[in-house]
Amino acid sequence: MILSTGAELRVTGPTSRYALVCTNGGQARETEGTWSASVEWLVGRLAPRLPDVGFAEVRYRVKSWRRLDSCFADARAAVSEVDAPRMLLLGFSMGGAVSIATADERGVEGVVGLAPWIPDELDVGSLRGKSLTVFHGALDRWLPGVPGVSPRHSRKGFERARAAGAAGRYVVIPGAVHGIALRSPWGGLVTLPRADRWADLVEAELRRWAETPPGAG
C-alpha cells in the first residue's frame, strides 16, 4: 500500500481492534527506504501467535537520520492509514526516535523501542501519560561501519521520557547485539543472537497491553 507521503505500508493481520505500527532504522547516507529485516522476522514470528493484533510495517521514502522529518511524516501517515482503535508503535534503532515523535497521534497508547536511538534533542513530551518499553541488547554498541546504539544511550532517553511523564520498563537482553535479523544477499533472513528472546519479550508486552484496559497503564 502506498501512503499519502509516498512511503509504503504492509499489514499482516486484522486492525479492527489492535495494531502495532513498526518503523525501521536508518543511516547517515540518504538512501531509499527498505523493509526492516528485524521487524519482518519479528512479524513473521508473532503474527500467528497474536491473531487479534494487526502488524503494520512502514517502509520510509528515505531511511536517513538526516531526513528525520521525512521519516516522521511517513510514520504519521501510516498511523492515520491504520487508524485502529488501539495502537502501539514499535521502533527499531532510528525507528525508536520516529515512533516517539509520532506517539502523540490519536489512538497511540505507547511505544516499544528495540535498541532505540533517542537523541538528546528529541522531544519526548509526546509520551506523557503513555508507555515506553525498551528492549536492548547488552552487546550493542557503535562499531566501524555498523551504526549500533549503546544501552547507555537508550537508557538516558528512557529516563528522560520517564521524567516527562511516561510509564515504562527497561530490559537488557544478555548476549544480544544490535537487531534481531539481517537480510542475506539472496533475500532470506538470518537471525542474530537471542532472536527468540527478543520475540518472547515483545510478545509478552503485546499480550500485557491488549489485556490492559485503555488508560489503565
How should each PLM-predicted stretch be described?
Residues 64-83, 198:
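Alpha/beta-hydrolase active-site loop
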Residues 107-118:
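A conserved short beta-strand
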Residues 2-52:
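Short, surface-exposed "cap/lid" segments of acyl-processing enzymes
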Residues 90-99:
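Gly/Ala-rich beta-loop-alpha elbow adjacent to hydrolase catalytic centers
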Residues 128, 133-140:
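Short beta-strand/loop motif that positions the catalytic acidic residue
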Residues 162-217:
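C-terminal catalytic histidine-bearing segment of alpha/beta-hydrolase fold enzymes
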Residues 34-45, 141-168:
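Active-site-adjacent alpha-helix of alpha/beta-hydrolase-fold enzymes
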